[in-house]
């Protein structure tokens, strides 16, 4: 008996088959047929070319030997391609990931569609309950109007897009639907066409009227008024018998305040803009307000200001002398009349007192010409007064509010007695004009 272990294929490593060769009677001494018998037993698994299960007897010629062959040749092992020396392994992995990434479609320059509508340029507003249409032009959003349906708002957007951007514009519907509009919009500017679209919208009307700025008053007449302007909630324009009259009154006021860019109910060309009065001359604006920043100067020739014309009165009080009053009326020559015990002073000794003069307490007051008040003596210490003023005293600069220069002054005669040192904290004061 001969055992033969053969490996049939590389994929089935570890799988072997054993064959038992019985050649005991190969010389012709066995039972029946003179040919040698070959018996093969599979211990683990059978090869694909075995037709029957293990234990089946295969009759092979005696002269043939056992042949082991491989049906499918093994594929050669794939060697990994080496990465370039200048490229790191991580960079190669990133390039491979980018190559497998799907290509994203490029966005259009018109912007994304509206989230609240399936149409471009249409948005639904819950506060108003309308579909409003807008279009972007030169970085600004232009309002086209409010509509009851999204379809009508989309139509308005398409017309504006064709007018603003030409036939290559991105629109919601086909271009052939707007052939009639193309013929009409050639004669209009962008502003005029936007006004036409707004007038066609349902959001253009306010109140219970189809015209802008017109409402039905409770008295049965039509009221015209403008919205927020000059910090006011609204401006009342009046009551009219018909809607058209009220609408035209609103149009005139809108053109007056907003110029040629005003949104009107009718064509702005139907109004004579040059003949309309200015906004400052109308009763609806506070025209009496004078906002100029300036200081008003009184008129000296006015009868009211003549009563308040003031002069300068100088009163000097001392225990041993009577009141000394210096007064100059407005409009006369700058000569001061000084009364000292009913005796006028010589003009060569006319001087004004400084703030620290000895022996006198100056009291400059502004009084009207027709009312001359006599002031009582100022309180002084009870001690005896002895003073001797110098013959020449420095000039006193007049107050800025009195209107007199330093040269227009009057002097007081020098006293013959000496006074004790007088306190220096006695400034001039100017009480308000009566």
Swiss-Prot record:
A motif (EAR) lies at residues 291-295. This is APETALA2-like protein 2. May form homodimer. Interacts with TPR2/ASP1. It is found in: Nucleus. A motif (Nuclear localization signal) lies at residues 106-115. Residues 1-116 are annotated as: Disordered. InterPro entries: AP2/ERF_dom (IPR001471), AP2/ERF_dom_sf (IPR036955), DNA-bd_dom_sf (IPR016177). Keywords: DNA-binding, Nucleus, Repeat, Transcription, Transcription regulation. GO terms for molecular function: DNA binding; DNA-binding transcription factor activity. Belongs to the AP2/ERF transcription factor family. AP2 subfamily. Residues 25-38 have a biased composition (Gly residues). PROSITE patterns: AP2_ERF. Residues 12-23 have a biased composition (Low complexity). Residues 72-87 have a biased composition (Pro residues). Residues 104-113 have a biased composition (Basic residues). SMART domains: AP2 (SM00380). Transmembrane segments: none annotated. Residues 118-174, 210-267 bind DNA. Probable transcription factor. Involved in spikelet transition. Together with SNB, controls synergistically inflorescence architecture and floral meristem establishment via the regulation of spatio-temporal expression of B- and E-function floral organ identity genes in the lodicules and of spikelet meristem genes. Prevents lemma and palea elongation as well as grain growth. One of its GO terms (cellular component) is nucleus. It holds the Pfam family AP2. One of its GO terms (biological process) is vegetative to reproductive phase transition of meristem.
């Amino acid at each position: 008996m001969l055992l033969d272990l053969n490996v049939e294929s590389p994929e089935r490593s570890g799988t072997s088959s054993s064959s038992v060769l019985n050649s005991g009677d190969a010389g012709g001494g066995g039972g029946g047929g003179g040919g040698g018998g070959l018996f093969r037993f599979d211990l683990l698994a059978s090869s694909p070319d075995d037709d029957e299960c293990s234990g089946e007897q295969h009759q092979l010629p005696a002269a043939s030997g056992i042949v082991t062959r491989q049906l499918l040749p093994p594929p050669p092992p794939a060697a990994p391609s080496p990465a370039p020396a200048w490229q790191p392994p991580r960079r190669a992995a990133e390039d491979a990931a980018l190559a497998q990434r799907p290509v994203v479609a490029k966005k259009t320059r018109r912007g994304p569609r509206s989230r609240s509508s399936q149409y471009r340029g249409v948005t639904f507003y819950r506060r108003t309950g309308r579909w409003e249409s807008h279009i972007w032009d030169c970085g600004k959003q232009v309002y086209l109007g409010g509509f009851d349906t999204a379809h009508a708002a989309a139509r308005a957007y398409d017309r504006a897009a064709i007018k603003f951007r030409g036939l290559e514009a991105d629109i919601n519907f086909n271009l052939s639907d707007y052939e009639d509009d193309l013929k009409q919009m050639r004669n209009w500017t962008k502003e005029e066409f936007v006004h036409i679209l707004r007038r066609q919208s349902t959001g253009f009307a306010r109140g219970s009227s189809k015209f802008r700025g017109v409402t039905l008053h409770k008295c049965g007449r039509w009221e015209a008024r403008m919205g927020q302007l000059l910090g006011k909630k609204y401006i009342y324009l009046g009551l009219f018998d018909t809607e058209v009259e009220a609408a035209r009154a609103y149009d005139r006021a809108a053109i007056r305040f907003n110029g040629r860019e005003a949104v009107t109910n009718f064509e702005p060309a139907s109004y004579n803009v040059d003949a309309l009065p200015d906004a400052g001359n109308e009763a609806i604006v506070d025209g009496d307000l004078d906002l100029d920043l300036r200081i008003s100067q009184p008129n000296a020739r006015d009868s009211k200001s003549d009563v308040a014309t003031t002069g300068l009165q100088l009163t000097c009080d001392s225990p041993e002398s009577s009141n000394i009053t210096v007064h100059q009326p407005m409009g006369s020559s700058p000569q001061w009349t000084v009364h000292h015990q009913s005796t006028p002073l010589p003009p060569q000794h006319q001087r004004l007192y400084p703030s620290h003069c000895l022996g006198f307490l100056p009291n400059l007051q502004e009084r009207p010409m027709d009312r001359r008040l006599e002031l009582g003596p100022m309180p002084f210490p009870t001690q005896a007064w002895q003073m001797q003023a110098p013959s020449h005293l420095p000039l006193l600069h007049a107050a800025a509010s009195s209107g007199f220069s330093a040269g227009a002054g009057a002097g007081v005669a020098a006293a013959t007695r000496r006074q004790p040192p007088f306190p220096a904290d006695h400034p001039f004061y100017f009480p308000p004009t009566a």
